[in-house]
UniProtKB/Swiss-Prot annotation:
GO MF: DNA binding; DNA-binding transcription factor activity
Positions of the HTH gntR-type domain: 16-84
Protein name listed in UniProt: Uncharacterized HTH-type transcriptional regulator YcbG
Keywords: DNA-binding, Transcription, Transcription regulation
Organism per entry: Bacillus subtilis (strain 168)
Signal peptide: none
DNA-binding residues: 44-63
Length: 233
């Protein structure tokens, strides 16, 4: 029997909270050393029996872990901790904070603000061209459907810093982009384009100070809008 799995409390707990508890128990297998990167997890039936949870709750938890790169589910092959998860502890931390959107937003701000200043020194012309394309895609989008182009804009900047230490962190964080994106109560395409243009101009001029300033203004705007929307629910 795996330690730390059998004590899940299910009384008067809603499904979302219960799924988070399941995530915590599964991650515990890794952090406690009972299982290691690349190891196979117990089957769904075994986990349901051990944790006393329904299949929908378990699958919601497993889906979150898979999205964040903590596990891989293979058809008819079972579920495994990813081979490189030991090199990406940030993915595990995000898995444990999936229901704490303000914390995820602030983590994203802290990371991206540092990366954009480095990007101002390292970004190349090809990456600048790709950035411009995302801005054009957003400007030309219909019905404000520009989530992927928005995500790509931030991904290009983050990876242009060319720092392998933080690359895994930003990739994990950007995976949560869709969750953050879904919390925006309404979109303002023209405002997004304006913010992105200012960031682009600062990067093109190799100005880390203005790049930092405009990225902060952009992310603060997004954060405040999301938090306001959450308060109104």
């Amino acid at each position: 029997m795996y330690e730390g799995l059998e004590d899940l409390k299910v009384d008067t707990v809603n499904r979302k909270t219960l799924a988070k508890q399941v995530i915590e128990r599964i991650v515990h297998l890794l952090s406690s050393g009972q299982l290691r990167a690349g190891d196979k997890l117990p089957t769904e039936m075994e986990l349901m029996d051990i944790l006393h949870v329904s299949r929908p709750v378990l699958r919601e938890a497993l889906s979150s872990l898979e999205t964040l790169g903590v596990i891989t589910r293979k058809t008819r092959g079972g579920t495994y901790f990813n081979d490189k998860i030991g090199m990406q502890p940030f993915s595990v931390m995000l898995a444990l904070a999936t229901d704490n959107l303000p914390a995820i937003i602030e983590a994203r701000m802290a990371l991206e603000l540092g990366l954009v200043t480095i990007a101002a020194e390292k970004i190349n012309e090809e990456e600048l061209q790709r950035l411009q394309k995302t801005i054009d895609d957003i400007a030309n989008s219909t019905d404000n459907h520009y989530g992927e182009a928005d995500k790509e804009f931030h991904r290009i900047i983050a990876l242009s810093a060319n720092n392998p230490v933080v690359e895994g962190m930003i990739q994990s964080l950007l995976i949560t982009h869709a969750k953050i994106d879904s919390q925006i109560p309404y979109r303002e395409r023209d405002v997004t384009v304006e913010y992105h243009k200012k960031i682009y101009d600062a990067l093109a001029k190799r100005d880390p100070y203005k790049a930092h300033y405009h990225m902060y203004e952009h992310l603060k705007f997004v954060r405040d809008k999301i938090l306001k929307g959450m308060d109104e629910k």
